[in-house]
């Protein structure tokens, strides 16, 4: 699991240069990177939103916390 500082740095990079943030997280030859690049070219704000989505929400795919019950007895 990434530390809070790592996630903060990834989010900061995603806000400044959205395709770079996705490239560092997923790789440069991925569909996520190409989508982020196109969205950033068409409009800077959609690129930022998509980059944040990739970094924050797709980061938790392998996490067991997301689907775990609150009270496990």
Curated annotation (Swiss-Prot):
The keyword Signal does not apply. Keywords: Membrane, Transmembrane, Transmembrane helix. It is found in: Membrane. The keyword Transmembrane helix applies. GO terms for cellular component: membrane. Belongs to the UPF0057 (PMP3) family. This is UPF0057 membrane protein At4g30650.
């Amino acid at each position: 699991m990434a530390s809070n500082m790592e996630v903060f740095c990834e989010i900061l990079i995603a806000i400044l240069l959205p395709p770079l943030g996705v490239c560092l997280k997923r790789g440069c030859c991925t569909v996520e990177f190409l989508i982020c690049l196109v969205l950033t070219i068409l409009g800077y704000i959609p690129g930022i939103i998509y980059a944040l989505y990739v970094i924050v929400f797709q980061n938790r795919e392998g996490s067991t916390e997301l689907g775990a019950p609150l009270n496990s007895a």
